[in-house]
Amino acid sequence: MSFPRPANTPWLVPYLTVRDASAAIAFYRNAFGFGVQDEVHDHGRPIHVEMTYQGQLMLMFAPEGAFGSTAKAPAGAGFECPQNFHLYCDDVDTVYQHALDQGAASIMAPHDAFWGERYAAVRDPDGYRWGLACRPATA
């Protein structure tokens, strides 16, 4: 029996549309610490990107217009993104600040949430919302 997905690949991976793939790579790398696993180019520009976090494939994306698509990033289409990504990280406050430094907009400043996690939220330059969370250190 064959394994239906590549090793170290989740069963579900978001595939986003971004305005500029090179800019998105820089944002996700510098804001969240993601790494590039695969990058396909056309005429010197990335048209398909796969990014990892903590050793797992986290997301894939293509720029607007790639492969003949008419899809737009939320910021490019002028609408509020209906989904929210929930990213666990080692230090919410630091990742939140890195995201702001890279051009994200604050949705919610870091705080101790009622459900027991340290939590913050940002909107990335393409309009996607990211919740940043970590569990409190145990004494």
Predicted regions and their residues:
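C-terminal catalytic core of tyrosine-transesterase DNA break-rejoin enzymes
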Residues: 126
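Vicinal oxygen chelate
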Residues: 1-15, 25-90, 94-123, 133-139
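Conserved beta-strand-loop-alpha-helix junction that forms the acyl-donor binding cleft
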Residues: 18-20
